[in-house]
From Swiss-Prot:
Gene behind the chain: prs2
Cofactor(s) needed by this chain: Mg(2+)
Any one annotated GO CC term: ribose phosphate diphosphokinase complex
Gene Ontology terms, MF aspect: ATP binding; kinase activity; magnesium ion binding; ribose phosphate diphosphokinase activity
Domain of life assignment: Bacteria
InterPro entries with a match to the protein in the record: PRib_PP_synth_CS, Pribosyltran_N, PRibTrfase_dom, PRTase-like, Rib-P_diPkinase, Rib-P_diPkinase_bac
Pfam families associated with the record: Pribosyl_synth (PF14572), Pribosyltran_N (PF13793)
Principal subcellular localisation of the protein: cytoplasm
Protein known as: Putative ribose-phosphate pyrophosphokinase 2
Binding site for ATP: 41-43, 100-101
CDD domains attached to this UniProt entry: PRTases_typeI
Length: 321
């Protein structure tokens, strides 16, 4: 399939070329030709090898590790498109790094998420498309439209097809800040929710307990970012002690930083489900399964280009089984 409108162009930078290629296949828009290289001193240079004049440009780039290299590559690409007279510049950032720095937790801390938003806008971006951004309020840091796609519909469809729904399943927030996400998935699965909390402060996460009844239930732990694996590991131990029969874990973004696999392999989690928003070179647990967000992002890209609403992609409809 080839998309009929030649005014839409799709470019992939270096953070996640595999995901960009899948998006290209689903949209029917071939990836544009460009070269991006890094000099010995770390400077990045980009050269687009085709015209973008009066075109609607979509640039696919997660700001994942190495975060700053990928962020600067994106900024330079935006500037290149702007100077080459692109009609619109739309950045597709499946994983938006720095979103966790959305407030001042202690005195004299920066709000780096706002700084990054300003840099992207100043470089010349007209719109941002992202996937389950860590803090939804970060959307307000941008002076351009932001489309934040929620991953819960993807996960819900997967679990329903796997038979994980209904009264035998309970969706658990592994920390008290994740209640809204857990409730959203539970609504799709027609299941109850529970929360893992800790008697001590959230940082130490000791003396954990469950608010809710997980005894004899199949537990699905849900979070947005899987980084060190500690949050899932601690929660898995708590729900196992509370009588969970099976434990699953799901996260939108699988960063799997160094040592995460070792942490997760020590606990009894049957399957860890993540999207392909991030590429990591670190070792991952053997029970990790990837669920591609490419078709989801591709549909959003076409809707944006055609001026159609994006919200129908994640509207909740009670499944008919």
């Amino acid at each position: 399939m080839v998309y009929s409108d030649s005014h839409l162009k799709l470019f992939a930078l270096n953070s996640n070329p595999g995901l960009a290629e899948k998006i290209s296949q689903f949209t029917g828009v071939p990836l544009g030709k460009l070269s991006s290289k890094q000099f010995s001193d770390g400077e990045i240079m980009i050269n687009m090898e085709e015209s973008v004049r009066s075109q609607d440009i979509f640039i696919v780039q997660s700001t994942s590790c190495p975060v700053n290299d990928h962020l600067w590559e994106l900024l330079i690409m935006i500037d290149a498109c702007k100077r080459a007279s692109a009609r619109t510049i739309n950045v597709v950032i499946p994983y938006f790094g720095y979103a966790r720095q959305d407030r001042t937790a202690t005195s004299r801390e920066p709000i780096t998420a706002k700084l990054v938003a300003d840099m992207i806008v100043k470089a010349g971006a007209d719109r941002l498309l992202t996937l389950d951004i860590h803090a939804v309020q970060v959307q307000g840091f941008f002076d351009i439209p932001v489309d934040n796609l929620f991953t819960v519909p993807l996960f819900a469809d997967y679990y329903r097809k796997s038979g994980l729904f209904g009264d035998d399943v309970i969706v658990v927030a592994p920390k008290n800040s994740g209640i809204k996400r857990a409730r959203s998935l539970a609504e799709y699965l027609e299941s109850a929710i529970a929360i893992v909390d800790y008697e001590d402060d959230d940082k130490n996460r000791e003396n954990g307990y469950v608010i809710g009844n997980v005894s004899g239930k199949k537990v699905i732990l849900i979070d947005d970012i899987l980084n060190t694996g500690v949050t899932f590991a601690n929660a898995a131990n708590v729900v196992r002690e509370a009588g969970a029969s099976e434990i699953y874990a799901v996260a939108s973004h699988g960063l799997f930083t160094s040592g995460a696999a070792d942490v997760l392999e020590k606990v009894d989690i049957k399957e860890i489900l993540v999207t392909d928003s991030v590429v990591t070179n670190h070792r991952k647990p053997l029970n990790v399964k990837y669920l591609s967000a490419a078709e989801y992002l591709a549909s959003a890209i076409l809707r944006i280009h055609e001026g159609r609403p994006v919200s129908p992609l994640f509207e909740h409809e009670k499944p008919q089984d």
